[in-house]
């Protein structure tokens, strides 16, 4: 029967397959070269995409090759043609703006070596619904150049998911804690919102949740700016609407010194800009197939992985969407028919059933990271809760009791019943008054910064969890590829024993070997990126620990100094009280 | 027989006062000077040595109790021990107490032999007793505060009562009570709560014009019986520092819950303070009631009280007592009326009529309002806010502790970064140290600030009781006045009636004489038969009327006389009662207004100033400890 099948095959089909093989090999060689390169080259590609005229000589060849690929895609599918042409049309006026600002930029660069950007985020609407709230981002440089951007709160989440999806192994803190949004954590919500609603508390301590959230958003943007890889991402540049070149030695300073609590109304132009950004973000999602807007906000630890990031479209269709092969491949080909597995559940989706391949963590370091992040998250939460409760008890309750006690002592000193001790009570009330004045708002701001630091660390741990979960999913995908490789190898083993019909069998063997080699190369590339992700994760943890140590250390030092000064003043108060008592006696 | 008993009691009191008067002058001054020298030399040494002496004397006391079997041995033991104790510890104040205690026994024997004394001697003894009591009151009024305070402080230093143990004792039939082991000088005795209650009620009747310190409220025995059960175990109560009741020697000898432990501790504290304040009251210490209460020979206090004729003869109500000498209650005092709650309305009506009484009641009303306001200020002001402050500090202590634990755990987990772990551990130590110092502060505030303030509130309540006593006496006086006036009005009415009756008799006699003249005129007109019959009828009517009037006059003459005699007797009695009550009221008002209340106000001012002094001291120590803690943290930081 095999001989009959071989006799039916026509030479023209063989020639076509050979041509297809050539195309695949060309694409594979280019991408294999990319996989060898570091992540900076990927950023360079995105950089060239953003700025066409700024291509350097070293990247010209890549640029040309990219254009060639794009041309081929445009020829095949009219959808892509429309998208790319619109993109180019949109960039033309930006190039004009670039020409205008280039002169200014060069002038500024001559004067200042390191540029310092101050970042400030203010609420642009009421905080009735946090998801629908609007925020105004102000970025200003020292030569009084300020840029104002309006963004919705959901846009921050969009940016978070885009960056997380594009840069595996990088931690981006979420915009704010998920507990506040879904109201799971009653303790935090009660303390945060109770403080605002309770009128008894003094205005210094009566900070608003808008202030906390603005600090968290500023911390997120600051983190992205400080990372040399993340800040060059096209999604981030679109989010910020930045047209100039970002200097490499850029430093971001968060302006959280004063906060009046007044909301800033959005102008009509900002609102229009916001709508345009929404449209643009939808297009970007459709291009990159990331589906960032579809991911629910509450699931911060679940990052969507797009298989198209790992595989070419053909391989993706062949592996995960067998039904769609009708368009590109001939079903009558006996080789392809034999290759398609009988049970389709294995490849139809990423959700695995009972037959899903099991994946176990081999690296002890990554397992340690899993343990570390869960413990650290819990510890930071505990610190946050206890410090909050400590503030409420010491700064609020004690002061309120002493305040009422002071009024009572004044009343007693004025009363005629206790005349001999009236002076003593009056001095005692004065002591309490001086206590309230001195210790009312002294260490409050400092403790508040500590709370925000703890909260930021909690959010970092959540982001780190998402990275680890991302890597787990990638491990599962590698298992799928391994299964595919095993099947291909078995197919080759079946074909190799037959040596009778040399021409037909050689042709089959070569096609099978080519396919096996292609899949094996992709597997190696993916596995290499998997190893790279592991290294990124470990580096990220080390960097976090260093940064955390520095920040906590500085914060604790300031707390220590303030506490010492506070105790000195406290002791001085009571020491001053005693001689007066002797004089009165 | 009752008169003889009163005379004997007066003789006893007189002898006791004489003995105490004799005992004090030759030794008191020298001993005070000696004690002052001891205190100047060293602060700690005088405190330690009396305790050791007490322990030794306790052993001697046990030996005495074991050896005592008959009265003869009881007589012989003091004579045998008097010599060596006198030689070894002549400088201590305890010896005059011992001597006075020993001297009482032969005097009692002497009083038993005095039953055969002559009546004249009895009367003279009674008079001397009265004069001596009044003299003592005058001397108390004359004393200055400067001389009073050192003596009080000296006594406080020399002899203080401690309640060593609180244990459960069963009295059969499934009932149980808490027994408090009291130590005073060299003797220990067990007393239950009802014994303290009985002592206080006796003192209120014996010294109605004196401010008796309060005792804690009564708790149900059933609750105690349920809560205090099981095997016995000792809970050593912690000491709360200086300037307060020292409970470091006290032990709760029972397995109790935390709340019950606090309750018993509170009771021990209040009862200890009660007894110590009684010791500082000179008027009370002149009598032997305190020493009798603390005498281990009197095992059962209730039996002692019932067997004692002095206590059993006291009237039940303090309003029927003689304020100067309650043991010498006269017949007049016994017959005084006791005002009820409705009599306050009468007081309001009476006060509107009389200006002098109105002024008096106004001044005392102002005083009462002042003390009520004072109590309110203490209770709702200082005490309330101190309690709230203590609670807030307690919560803060918990927060410090939790932060310390969290930082310590975090430092342990973050061992990779050595520098950060080290600093976190130092910071956790700082928070833990702050928690410990705050715990000490909370304990001190609770035991040495809040509870003394609570005692001050109760003392103010006792002061109001004194004012109420005076008020009831005033009501009593008003009742007597009212009844006296009503009796006098009745007497006047009777006299007026007598006068009216005499006038009527005169009129009747005149009319009778007139009728006689008419009778003479009738024979002149007897010419006709009609005139004769009409004149006869009229004469008969007059005769009948005259006879009726005469009979009525004879009947009324005897009754008014008897009534007037009775009324005069009652008026005389009421006049005597009025005189007595007015004198008593004057004395009571004078003593309360000029002696007791100023004394109390000085004491309360001293107490409040001491409380605030301790408060500032505790706060200062707390601040200093906190500063040292954070300085140490900074030192470690600089060293790292």
Curated annotation (Swiss-Prot), chain A:
For this protein, the record's Pfam families field holds: PX, Vps5
| Residue ranges, annotated region (Disordered) | 27-59
Report the InterPro entries cross-referenced here.
AH/BAR_dom_sf, PX_dom, PX_dom_sf, Vps5_C
PANTHER family linked to this entry: FI18122P1 (PTHR10555:SF170), SORTING NEXIN (PTHR10555)
GO cellular component entries = cytoplasm; cytosol; endosome; vacuolar membrane
- GO biological process per UniProt: protein retention in Golgi apparatus; regulation of TORC1 signaling; retrograde transport, endosome to Golgi
To which species is this protein native?
A: Saccharomyces cerevisiae (strain ATCC 204508 / S288c) (Baker's yeast)
> What is the official name of this protein in its record?
Uncharacterized protein YKR078W
Name the Gene Ontology molecular function terms of this record.
phosphatidylinositol binding; phosphatidylinositol-3-phosphate binding; phosphatidylserine binding
Q: Please, what other remarks does the record include? A: Present with 1270 molecules/cell in log phase SD medium.
From Swiss-Prot, chain B:
Keyword check for Translocase: no
Please list the residues that carry the modification Phosphoserine. 361, 363
Tell me the InterPro entries matching this sequence: AH/BAR_dom_sf, PX_dom, PX_dom_sf, PX_Snx41/Atg20, Sorting_Nexin_Autophagy
> Cross-referenced SMART domains, in alphabetical order?
PX (SM00312)
Lipid bilayer topology: Peripheral membrane protein
Q: Which UniProt keywords apply?
A: Acetylation, Autophagy, Coiled coil, Endosome, Lipid-binding, Membrane, Phosphoprotein, Protein transport, Transport
Give TM regions: none
Among SUPFAM superfamilies, the record links this protein to:
PX domain
Q: Which CDD domains match?
A: BAR_Atg20p, PX_SNX41_42
Q: Which cysteines are joined by disulfide bonds?
A: none
- Where does this chain mainly localize? membrane
Coiled-coil region: 475-512, 562-593
Q: Which domain of life is it from?
A: Eukaryota
Tell me, how does this one assemble?
A: Forms a complex with SNX4 and ATG17.
Cite any additional comment in the entry. Answer: Present with 358 molecules/cell in log phase SD medium.
Domain topic, free-text comment: The PX domain binds phosphatidylinositol 3-phosphate which is necessary for peripheral membrane localization of ATG20 to the perivacuolar punctate structures.
- Please give the family membership noted in the entry: Belongs to the sorting nexin family.
Full protein name:
Autophagy-related protein 20
Q: Which organism is it from?
A: Saccharomyces cerevisiae (strain ATCC 204508 / S288c)
Q: What is the lineage of its organism?
A: Eukaryota, Fungi, Dikarya, Ascomycota, Saccharomycotina
């Amino acid at each position: 029967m095999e001989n009959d099948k071989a006799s039916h095959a026509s030479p023209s089909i063989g020639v076509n397959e050979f041509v297809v093989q050539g195309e695949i090999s060309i694409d594979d060689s280019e991408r294999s070269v990319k996989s060898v390169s570091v992540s900076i080259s990927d950023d360079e590609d995105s950089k060239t995409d953003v700025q066409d005229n700024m291509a350097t000589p070293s990247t010209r060849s890549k640029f040309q090759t990219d254009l060639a690929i794009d041309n081929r895609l445009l020829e095949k599918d009219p959808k892509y043609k429309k998208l790319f042409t619109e993109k180019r049309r949109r960039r033309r006026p930006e190039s004009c703006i670039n020409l205008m600002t280039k002169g200014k930029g060069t002038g500024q660069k001559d004067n200042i070596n390191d540029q310092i950007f101050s970042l400030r985020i203010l609420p642009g609407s009421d905080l009735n619904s946090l998801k629908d709230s609007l925020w105004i981002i102000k970025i200003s440089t020292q030569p009084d150049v300020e840029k104002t951007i309006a963004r919705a709160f959901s846009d921050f989440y969009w940016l978070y998911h885009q960056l997380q999806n594009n840069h595996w192994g990088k931690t981006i803190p979420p915009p704010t804690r998920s507990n506040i949004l879904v109201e799971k954590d009653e303790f935090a919500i009660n303390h945060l919102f109770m403080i605002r609603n309770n009128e008894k508390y003094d205005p210094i301590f009566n900070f608003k949740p808008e202030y906390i959230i603005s600090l968290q958003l500023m911390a997120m943007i600051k983190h992205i700016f400080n990372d040399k890889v993340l800040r060059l991402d096209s999604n981030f540049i679109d989010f910020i609407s930045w047209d100039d070149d970002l200097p490499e030695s850029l430093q971001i300073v968060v302006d959280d010194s004063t906060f009046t609590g007044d909301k800033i109304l959005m102008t009509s132009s900002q609102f229009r800009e916001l709508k345009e950004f929404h449209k643009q973000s939808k297009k970007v999602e459709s291009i990159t197939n990331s589906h960032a807007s579809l991911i629910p906000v509450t699931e911060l630890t679940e990052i969507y992985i797009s298989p198209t990031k790992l595989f070419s479209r053909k391989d993706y269709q062949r592996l995960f969407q067998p039904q769609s092969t009708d368009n590109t491949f001939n079903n009558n080909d006996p080789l392809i028919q034999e290759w398609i597995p009988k049970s389709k559940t294995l490849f139809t989706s990423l959700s695995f059933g009972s037959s899903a391949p099991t994946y176990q963590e081999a690296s002890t370091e990554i397992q340690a990271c899993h343990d570390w992040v869960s413990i650290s998250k819990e510890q930071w939460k505990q610190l946050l809760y206890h410090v909050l409760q400590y503030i409420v008890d010491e700064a609020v309750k004690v002061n309120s009791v002493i305040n009422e006690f002071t009024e009572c002592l004044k009343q007693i000193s004025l009363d005629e019943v206790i005349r001999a001790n009236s002076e003593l009570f009056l001095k005692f009330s004065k002591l309490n008054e001086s206590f309230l004045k001195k210790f009312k708002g002294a260490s409050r701001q400092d403790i508040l910064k500590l709370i925000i630091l703890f909260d930021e660390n909690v959010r970092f741990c959540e982001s780190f969890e998402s990275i680890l979960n991302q890597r787990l999913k990638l491990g599962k995908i590698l298992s799928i590829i391994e299964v595919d490789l095993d099947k291909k190898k078995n197919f080759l083993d079946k074909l190799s024993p037959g040596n009778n019909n040399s021409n037909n069998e050689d042709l089959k063997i070569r096609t099978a070997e080519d396919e096996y080699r292609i899949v094996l190369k992709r597997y190696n590339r993916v596995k290499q990126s998997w190893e790279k992700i592991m290294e990124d994760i470990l580096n990220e943890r080390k960097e976090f620990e260093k940064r955390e140590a520095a920040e906590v250390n500085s914060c604790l030092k300031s707390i220590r100094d303030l506490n010492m000064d506070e105790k000195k003043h406290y002791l001085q108060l009571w020491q001053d009280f005693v001689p007066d008592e002797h004089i009165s006696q | 027989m009752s008169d003889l008993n009163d005379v004997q009691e007066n003789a006893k009191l007189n002898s006791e006062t004489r003995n105490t008067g004799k005992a004090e002058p030759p030794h008191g001054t020298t001993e005070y000077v000696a004690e002052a020298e001891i205190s100047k030399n060293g602060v700690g040494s005088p405190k330690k040595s009396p305790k050791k002496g007490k322990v030794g004397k306790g052993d001697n006391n046990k030996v005495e109790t074991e050896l005592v079997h008959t009265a003869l041995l009881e007589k012989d033991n003091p004579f045998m021990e008097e010599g060596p104790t006198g030689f070894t510890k002549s400088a201590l104040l305890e010896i005059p107490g011992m001597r006075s205690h020993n001297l009482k026994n032969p005097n009692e024997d002497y009083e038993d032999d005095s039953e055969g004394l002559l009546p004249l001697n009895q009367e003279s003894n009674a008079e001397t007793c009265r004069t001596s009591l009044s003299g003592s009151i005058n001397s108390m009024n004359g004393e200055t505060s400067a001389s009073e305070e050192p003596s009080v402080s000296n006594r406080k230093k020399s002899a203080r009562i401690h309640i060593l143990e609180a244990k459960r004792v069963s009295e059969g039939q499934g009932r149980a009570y808490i027994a408090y082991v009291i130590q005073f000088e060299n003797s220990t005795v067990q007393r239950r709560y009802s014994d303290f209650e009985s002592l206080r009620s006796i003192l209120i009747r014996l010294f109605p014009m004196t401010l008796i310190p309060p005792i804690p409220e009564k708790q149900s025995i059933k609750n105690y019986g349920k809560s205090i059960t099981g095997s016995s175990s000792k809970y050593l109560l912690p000491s709360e520092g200086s300037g307060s009741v020292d409970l470091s020697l006290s032990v709760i000898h029972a397995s109790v819950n935390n709340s019950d432990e606090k309750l018993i501790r509170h009771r021990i504290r209040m009862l200890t303070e009660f007894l110590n304040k009684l010791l500082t009251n000179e008027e009370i210490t002149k009598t032997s009631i305190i020493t009798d209460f603390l005498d281990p020979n009197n095992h059962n206090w209730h039996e002692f009280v019932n067997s004692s004729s002095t206590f059993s003869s006291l009237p039940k109500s303090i309003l029927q007592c003689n304020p100067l000498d309650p043991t010498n209650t006269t017949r007049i005092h016994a017959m005084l009326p006791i005002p009820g709650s409705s009599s306050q309305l009468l007081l309001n009506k009476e006060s509107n009529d009389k200006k002098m009484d109105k002024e008096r009641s106004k001044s005392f009303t102002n005083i009462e309002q002042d003390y009520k306001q004072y109590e309110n200020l203490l209770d709702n002001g200082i005490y309330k806010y101190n309690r709230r402050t203590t609670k807030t500090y307690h919560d803060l202590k918990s927060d410090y502790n939790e932060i310390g634990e969290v930082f310590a755990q975090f430092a342990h987990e973050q061992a990779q970064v050595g520098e950060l772990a080290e600093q976190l551990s130092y910071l956790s130590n700082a928070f833990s140290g702050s928690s410990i110092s705050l715990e000490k502060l909370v304990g001190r505030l609770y035991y040495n600030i809040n509870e003394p303030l609570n005692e001050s509130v109760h003392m103010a309540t006792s002061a109001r009781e004194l004012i109420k006593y005076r008020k009831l006496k005033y009501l009593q006086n008003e009742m007597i006045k009212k009844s006296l006036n009503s009796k006098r009005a009745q007497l006047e009415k009777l006299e007026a009636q007598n006068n009216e009756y005499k006038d009527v008799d005169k009129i009747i006699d005149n009319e009778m004489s007139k009728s006689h003249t008419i009778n003479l005129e009738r024979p002149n007109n007897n010419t006709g038969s009609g005139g004769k019959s009409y004149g006869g009828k009229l004469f008969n009517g007059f005769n009948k009327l005259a006879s009726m009037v005469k009979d009525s006059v004879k009947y009324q003459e005897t009754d008014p006389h008897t009534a007037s005699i009775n009324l005069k007797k009652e008026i005389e009695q009421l006049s005597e009662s009025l005189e007595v009550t007015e004198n008593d009221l004057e004395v009571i008002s004078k003593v309360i207004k000029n002696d007791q209340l100023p004394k109390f106000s000085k004491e309360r001012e001293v107490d409040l100033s001491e409380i605030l002094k301790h408060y500032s001291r505790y706060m200062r120590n707390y601040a200093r400890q906190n500063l040292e803690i954070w300085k140490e943290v900074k030192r470690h930081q600089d060293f790292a």
